[in-house]
Amino acid sequence: MDIKRTILIVALAIVSYVMVLKWNQDYGQAALPTQNVASSTTAPGLPDAPTGTSAANDDIPRAASDTTAPAEAPVAASKDLIQIKTDVLDLAVDPQGGDIAQLRLPLYPRRQDHPEIPFQLFDNGNERTYLAQSGLIGSNGPDASPAGRPIYSAEKKSYQLADGQDQLVVDLKFSKDGVNYIKRFTLKRGLYDITVSYLIDNESAQPWTGAMFAQLKRDASSDPSSSTATGTATYLGAALWTSSEPYKKVSMKDMDKVNEDKSKAPITENVQGGWVAWLQHYFVTAWIPPKGENNQVLARKDSKGNYIIGYTGPSMTVAPGAKAETSAILYAGPKSQAVLKELSPGLELTVDYGFLWFIAQPIFWLLQHIHSLVGNWGWSIIFLTMLIKGIFFPLSAASYKSMARMRAVAPKLAALKEKFGDDRQKMSQAMMELYKKEKINPLGGCLPILVQMPVFLSLYWVLLESVEMRQAPFMLWITDLSIKDPFFILPIIMGATMFIQQQLNPTPPDPMQAKVMKMMPIIFTFFFLWFPAGLVLYWVVNNCLSIAQQWYITRKIEAATKKAAA
């Protein structure tokens, strides 16, 4: 029994550690299959799938092959960004194309020790490229011009949501060939979603035809919001919604494969409504088209090495003298499950808890409700641990009773070892007969470990993925439960509790097994050195409760045994 238990503990420890190291390899999620989609397979009313790129606008989807654009001189990129601020967003819009080139989150500091510096989500500088693009393409779309994208004008260079104001509307204007365009940004107090609308006023004598596109463009730079200590980087890449799969990932490697094989068309999906998103640690950006709209999703890598996930909406025609409007929602902010679920079905799945999501979701739900009462995530973890321990108490009690009986028959086991010596077969047979006679389950001590491991791994992913845990303080030196203990005090305490718990267990009869078991607290302490402090806190509290339970049950059984003997 002891060697089996030792092997089980070591195996689970190794498996747990490896799973943590491999988190960023997308557990349980199938990669988006590459599809060779010809232009004839596009959904009804959609422009043809992009089949190439131009030197001027490599990052913009191409219009249909018969598109022509009026000749005009190339224009230089604009350097004067339009600043827009609300209580939760601080963004900068490039007048050329109206792209959101910079976006900061004032309520989420870059670092805990510098709360005045907000986390920057979008950036289109020399060191990093990450921005949200949208425009109008098609036969008459201004963003389809080979000469360059339109340069919008604005009444001011800076806009800010005033006190007492719940909504901020910013209009960018552009006119060409008798058609007036307004690109409108609508932002609301307390919300991270931005409505991007196009108002088209056709004052020309010809029908206007085009379609809206929206995309997220990012380079291959690392995730600034993620910690890579011991390889615990979360998923950095694209994702989308389809009717058959509400959460489908498209990794950078997927786009690389298509880019390397020129015979393959870009990765495309025809969807109705849905969303496209770019994921990183704690934060997500997503374009959400109108519900019921037929769209073509495109994922690709451009010639500059940037990765793009976006969609093209249905083609629309505006008659001479008529007006039209099309829009989409851009979300750029924290992975708040409740908010994301309200925006679009399946978007909340970007909070990726891995293949144990069915355990992680209830754990997070419990944590949230406990936190609403105690107001501290550290204490929430402690009370959650107590609750879990209470739920599994019957199982733990049975296990501890089994171990107490094992301790009671330890002299008999020693006598069997002395009797049979090196004859392992007879020794094992005699041990099993003894266990049967004493009504001992030789695997009973393993059950709590087996039960705890899924909960342990699920809680790890909850702490890793939930933005609510980001920079969440506990007490004393623990100022952030989502990162490692800066002084490694909690892991050392955890190792000490494991050692104490080990003393309550029966000593393995084999000397080699005993040595291995003595090493387990040291091994686990090393594993936990770089784990999130919240996870180590859970394990420390769990061990302390286990020690109390085991001591109580063992003493109770020993007292009953002495009473029966008397």
Curated annotation (Swiss-Prot):
Gene3D superfamilies: 2.70.98.90. The keyword Phosphoprotein does not apply. Disulfide bonds: none annotated. Pfam families: 60KD_IMP, YidC_periplas. It is found in: Cell inner membrane. It is a multi-pass membrane protein. One of its GO terms (molecular function) is membrane insertase activity. Keywords: Cell inner membrane, Cell membrane, Chaperone, Membrane, Protein transport, Transmembrane, Transmembrane helix, Transport. Belongs to the OXA1/ALB3/YidC family. Type 1 subfamily. This is Membrane protein insertase YidC. The lineage of its organism: Bacteria, Pseudomonadati, Pseudomonadota, Gammaproteobacteria, Pseudomonadales. The gene is yidC.
